[in-house]
Amino acid sequence: MAPSADMTSLPLGVKVEDSAFGKPAGGGSGQAPGAAAATAAAMGADEEGAKPKVSPSLLPFSVEALMADHRKPGAKESSLAASESAQAAGGLAQPLGVPPGSLGAPDAPSSPRPLGHFSVGGLLKLPEDALVKAESPEKPERTPWMQSPRFSPPPARRLSPPACTLRKHKTNRKPRTPFTTAQLLALERKFRQKQYLSIAERAEFSSSLSLTETQVKIWFQNRRAKAKRLQEAELEKLKMAAKPMLPPAAFGLSFPLGGPAAVAAAAGASLYGASGPFQRAALPVAPVGLYTAHVGYSMYHLT
């Protein structure tokens, strides 16, 4: 709306002709009232164009909305509703403890809002019953985010019983042959005579015992393996019995008492003992040839 001619008049009774707007550009003293009104209308239009225009389509979190100094009341309410809806939906659109309208309009006074559980004020104002964990299992303390199905722990899976680790036999395994006492005695007697049977001897011996050749063959194989194990056990026992209880020369001297080593040791002791300020009695030297043999286990039999 363009201003009228009465609105453009200056206060204190100053006429339009005497003001700067009424003077012509060439220094003339008079100007028509219509021209003055047109000039004032043009300047009013320029002032309105110079004012920043806020686009109604700005987002509440855009750079233009944050940098704008003047916001409309409707825009503030819309930004507040948008921020609250975003916080209720995801909880990540706005930092904790920050009022919803502070991001959209920095100079707008923020309305008081209830303190959250994780804000500083909320932690300070929580009662002691909420801070201390409930001891009774009937009423466990659970926060709202823990009650959400998104944060609920998955149900515990039941562990399946371990598989059986027993050895599985072949399905086509033949049953064990039940030998009679007479058959076992005959097989043992034949094994002591000869451990390896030829094909003809095995066929004749198996027919005499009413057994198959395969049964006689397998029995001889098992009997030879058993005899080998018994023989190895007997050899191990003989080796253990042959070993002495004490290792040789463990406690005996490995050098002769009357040898050159004893003579040299006695000579050195007498040499250094006589030269020192404190003389010590030299050890008696055994005559050469006495106890020339190495002293081993025989030293225990000396009387």
UniProtKB/Swiss-Prot annotation:
Assembly with partners or alone: Interacts with CREBBP/CBP, TBP and SP1; interaction with these transcription activators may inhibit autoinactivation. Interacts (via C-terminus) with PIAS1 (via N-terminus); the interaction is required for the localization of both proteins to the nuclear periphery and specific binding of MSX1 to the core enhancer region in target gene promoters. Interacts with H1-5.
Region (Disordered) location: 18-56, 69-116, 133-163
Q: Where is the composition biased (Basic and acidic residues)?
A: 133-142
Q: Where's it found, cell-wise?
A: Nucleus
- Quote the InterPro entries the UniProt record gives: HD, HD_metazoa, Homeobox_CS, Homeodomain-like_sf, Msh_Homeobox_Regulators
- Gene3D superfamilies linked: Homeodomain-like
Q: What is this protein called?
A: Homeobox protein MSX-1
Q: Which organism is it from?
A: Callithrix jacchus (White-tufted-ear marmoset)
An example GO BP is: mesenchymal cell proliferation
Query: What lineage does UniProt assign to this protein's organism?
Result: Eukaryota, Metazoa, Chordata, Craniata, Vertebrata
Q: Which residues form a coiled coil?
A: none
Query: Per UniProt, what is one GO molecular function of this protein?
Result: DNA-binding transcription activator activity, RNA polymerase II-specific
Q: Mind telling me which PROSITE patterns this protein's record contains? A: HOMEOBOX_1, HOMEOBOX_2
Pfam families named among the record's database cross-references: Homeodomain
Position of the Glycyl lysine isopeptide (Lys-Gly) (interchain with G-Cter in SUMO) cross-link: K15, K133
| Record key words, sorted | Developmental protein, DNA-binding, Homeobox, Isopeptide bond, Nucleus, Repressor, Transcription, Transcription regulation, Ubl conjugation
